[in-house]
Amino acid sequence: MASVGVAAGRQAEDTLPPPAEPPLPEMKPLPQPQPPPSVSAQQPQPAPKPPSPAGVKAEENCSFLPLVHSIIKCMDKDSPDIHQDLNTLKAKFQEMRKVVSTMPGIHLSPEQQQQQLQRLREQVRTKNELLQKYKSLCMFEIPKE
């Protein structure tokens, strides 16, 4: 009895029009991996640098949520510490305004930023094309004596 309902449901699915989704873009196959160069030709790679303390500090200082939470808790308890927390939040806002004003490109209009982004994307695309072109060139090995 259950198989009849399943079959009827499948027939209904078959009669539905296909969804109006755009076709997926055609994906290019990845290039074949190159064998690693010989150990003697390999140059020592510098170790990756750990994130700078200033960068880590900046990420930690950007969160306003703990201060806002503390202010709300003080308001619920009618605590006298609320003025201190509000002043801390105000100082943090001023500090973040200074950080934002020193960011590169902040002086540009949104249109100029979009133009710069398009130029940079075009440069990346061109460089990737050149890289693929150079990778596909026939490489000749120097005979060993």
From Swiss-Prot:
Modification Phosphoserine, positions: S109
Described purpose of this protein according to its UniProt entry: Component of the Mediator complex, a coactivator involved in the regulated transcription of nearly all RNA polymerase II-dependent genes. Mediator functions as a bridge to convey information from gene-specific regulatory proteins to the basal RNA polymerase II transcription machinery. Mediator is recruited to promoters by direct interactions with regulatory proteins and serves as a scaffold for the assembly of a functional preinitiation complex with RNA polymerase II and the general transcription factors.
DNA-binding in keyword set: no
Subcellular localization: Nucleus
Source organism superkingdom: Eukaryota
Annotated family: Belongs to the Mediator complex subunit 9 family.
An annotated GO cellular component: mediator complex
Post-translational modification N-acetylalanine, affected residues: A2
Keywords: Acetylation, Activator, Coiled coil, Nucleus, Phosphoprotein, Transcription, Transcription regulation
GO terms, biological process: regulation of transcription by RNA polymerase II
Positions of region (Disordered): 1-58
Keyword Phosphoprotein attributed: yes
This protein's name: Mediator of RNA polymerase II transcription subunit 9
InterPro entries registered for this protein in UniProt: Med7/Med21-like, Med9, MED9_metazoa
Biased composition (Pro residues): 16-38
Subunit structure: Component of the Mediator complex, which is composed of MED1, MED4, MED6, MED7, MED8, MED9, MED10, MED11, MED12, MED13, MED13L, MED14, MED15, MED16, MED17, MED18, MED19, MED20, MED21, MED22, MED23, MED24, MED25, MED26, MED27, MED29, MED30, MED31, CCNC, CDK8 and CDC2L6/CDK11. The MED12, MED13, CCNC and CDK8 subunits form a distinct module termed the CDK8 module. Mediator containing the CDK8 module is less active than Mediator lacking this module in supporting transcriptional activation.
Coiled-coil regions listed: 111-138
GO MF entries: transcription coregulator activity
Predominant localisation class: nucleus
The organism's taxonomic lineage, starting at the top: Eukaryota, Metazoa, Chordata, Craniata, Vertebrata
PANTHER family with a match to the protein in the record: MEDIATOR OF RNA POLYMERASE II TRANSCRIPTION SUBUNIT 9 (PTHR20844:SF0), MEDIATOR OF RNA POLYMERASE II TRANSCRIPTION, SUBUNIT 9 (PTHR20844)
